[in-house]
Amino acid sequence: MIFKPKNSPYNLDNKGVYSAWREQKLALYPATAEDLLVTLSGDPNTAGDEYAAMQERLADFNMVVYAHRPIEADEPMASKKFLNTLIRRFGLLRLDAHQCADDDSISLLSVAEGGERKRYIPYSNRAISWHTDGYYNTPDHQIRGMGLHCIHPAA
């Protein structure tokens, strides 16, 4: 069991704090998907307005969507290094090395023609409804954040 301070909105024993948190989140609910969007100049160490805009959306919506001009697969934006650098700026420091992850704990999602990955929807051309895995993990290994960096449009 994870300790939740009495004044935490996640401590459901404190209905007043939870209700205030819930009302604030509902008031901030994005009207359109574009409300989640931040356009990046290309540097994963982005500073100033871009970083502040991403932080604001994370605080308001618990997520942010970023976009960049179309890129070639061999450009730095296409690399796992870009994603890793960016997510670390937002506190995602411990990556989950699940059974299909690469050595760096980052998974490239593409259609797998064989092997273990072929069995799982993220490595197929079947429709997926994203969720954060890890609900079955122990409390000290729960997944509390996720970074997705799309190089190519979905099939």
Segments predicted by a language model, with ranges:
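Fe(II)/2-oxoglutarate oxygenase catalytic core
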Residues: I2-A155
